[in-house]
UniProtKB/Swiss-Prot annotation:
Family: Belongs to the ABC transporter superfamily. Phosphonates importer (TC 3.A.1.9.1) family.
Tree of life domain: Bacteria
Name assigned to this protein: Phosphonates import ATP-binding protein PhnC 1
Gene3D superfamilies with a match to the protein in the record: P-loop containing nucleotide triphosphate hydrolases
Localization of this protein: Cell inner membrane
PROSITE patterns attached to this UniProt entry: ABC_TRANSPORTER_1, ABC_TRANSPORTER_2, PHNC
Quaternary structure (record): The complex is composed of two ATP-binding proteins (PhnC), two transmembrane proteins (PhnE) and a solute-binding protein (PhnD).
UniProt organism field: Pseudomonas aeruginosa (strain UCBPP-PA14)
Principal location: membrane
Enzyme Commission number, as recorded: 7.3.2.2
Amino acid sequence: MSAVIRVDSLNKTFARKQALFNLKLEIQAGEMVALIGASGSGKSTLLRHVAGLARCDRDNGGSIDVLGRRLQASGRLSGEVRRLRADIGYIFQQFNLVNRLSVLDNVLLGFLGRMPRWRGSLGLFSAEQKRQALEALARVGLADFAGQRASTLSGGQQQRVAIARALTQKAEVILADEPIASLDPESARKVMDILADINRHDGKTVVVTLHQVDYALRYCPRAVALKGGRILFDGSSEHLSEGFLNELYGAEGDTPLLFSDRARRGAESQPELTLARA
């Protein structure tokens, strides 16, 4: 099986400070993968590169392929980047909605990558596209809010609108950057339930950066742990031990771990970690 996402020898430097070191990663179709690590570990930087929103180093920067096509290499984005972005749904931590537009209009924006630019700029969406957008809103439990301005919604509701937009985009790969970081536990659970449902029932590949490890244990069969721009672990989430996680997060202490008794027992019953080699 060919990888849906292939990262090969990725390096990234910001103002002479290297942020990513020779990262190698393959993700198969239909996987749900958590990228975990402390703040500044490189997980969001990695995700932005996979989305084509950031460029790797020009010298020895490595390459990234998505859906079997070259996205970028050695600091240059592929000529196919616009078409590839149409297949990549990106969910931002801060929702990235247009507050002055209605909820429905925000979801319709997901179609822009697959329609002529002149039609998109004029907002000429078809009746079928509007039907699909309403269907996507119903799936995330927000059909009744279609006519409201996006700015009137809570943070959790706005994040669900962003997911509905990715559904209308018909993306094969969904990348979610800290989608629950600013949400209360109930809103976070709803967002993760929806992402898991899309992965399970639609077969979409989902990669999500998470600070809260208990959500990675609960929702993502595979975890990739980063520290200082290097991959330290890549494997089953069940194999993450509390000792390793305490070392991974260091001075941040217990805050991101949030182990439930069940999660803690599951992690502690697993064999010792085998660290990935960067």
